[in-house]
Regions:
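A glycine-rich, often tryptophan-bearing local segment used as a flexible ligand/cofactor-contacting loop or short
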Residues: 69-137
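A glycine-centered loop/beta-turn motif at secondary-structure junctions
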Residues: 3-7, 16, 152-222
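A structural signal for well-ordered alpha-helical scaffolds and beta->alpha junctions
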Residues: 21, 25, 101, 127-131, ...
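Helical hinge/lid and interdomain linker segments adjacent to catalytic or ligand-binding clefts
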Residues: 6-10, 16-98
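Residue-level preference for short coil/turn positions at secondary-structure junctions
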Residues: 3, 55-56, 85, 130, ...
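Short, glycine/charged-enriched secondary-structure capping and boundary segments
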Residues: 22-25, 74-78, 104-107, 175, ...
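Residues at the C-termini of beta-strands that transition into short coil/loop
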Residues: 11, 42-44, 93, 138, ...
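Catalytic beta-strand/loop cores that center a nucleophilic Ser/Cys/Thr
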Residues: 26-27, 31, 35, 106, ...
């Protein structure tokens, strides 16, 4: 049996205005449990130790709901060091609330600008990303979800692999890019537990976690 990799899930149990961590934790444990040993926490100070903890975490998953507060400078620096040094960062839905720090906004690759009402959305793979390992075994899918909208960071070369249809337009719903020696993936769906249940999206989450985690494995970190 292949040894499981360690993954850190960061979110908010007690101070989550819209997206509490526990429902997402249950779903992610079911999706990733065969390949990852998942540790969930709402202690943002864990970011200070990501580079140095014994054994380390090849993957950090952000499901943070910190829209109304900023990370400390030390917490921000810890996450930046971790990813630049080879750690993988998977940001799901409201995890983009880390944009409260402009440095983290740039690392994620875009700014959340708002969302129209919750509604049925059709998600599809982009033509440009056909053959990307993130899309292996992933079919198009339909999901009731919050249509998060974004303004791209002009200095980040994102590779968009997932889109959703909204008012006659096809808009980004998933992208990836390198950051130093690390890899960053953003996935838009994830408002609540049912968001995680379509089989194609579960496969996409598994692919994204494995792909992002490989950045650290292939880095020069000791």
């Amino acid at each position: 049996m292949m040894e499981k990799k360690k993954a850190l899930l960061l979110g908010d149990y007690t101070d989550a205005p819209w997206h509490p961590l526990e429902p997402a934790r249950v779903e992610l444990e079911a999706i990733l449990g065969e390949a990852f040993e998942l540790t969930a926490t709402e202690d943002y100070d864990v970011l200070l130790r990501l580079q140095t903890e014994a054994g380390g975490y090849p993957l950090c998953i952000a499901y943070t709901d910190c829209w109304n507060r900023e990370l400390t400078k030390a917490q921000t620096a810890g996450l930046l060091r971790y990813v630049a040094g080879g750690g993988g960062l998977l940001v799901i839905h409201n995890g983009i609330s880390l944009q409260c720090s402009y440095e983290l906004l740039q690392m994620i690759g875009a700014e959340f600008t708002g969302h129209p009402p919750y509604q049925k959305l059709r998600y599809s793979r982009t033509a440009e990303a056909q053959g990307h390992p993130l899309l292996e075994g992933v079919e198009d899918f339909v999901l009731d979800e919050e249509p998060y909208l974004f303004a791209p960071d002009p200095f980040v070369e994102r590779r968009i692999f997932l889109e959703f249809e909204f008012e006659g337009n096809r808009l980004p719903a998933g992208w990836e890019h390198d950051y130093g020696l690390g890899r960053v993936v953003y996935l838009q769906p994830g408002h609540h537990a049912p968001s995680f249940r379509p089989a194609p999206y579960r496969r996409l989450i598994r692919n994204s976690a494995s792909w992002a985690a490989a950045g650290r494995v292939e880095s020069t970190l000791g």
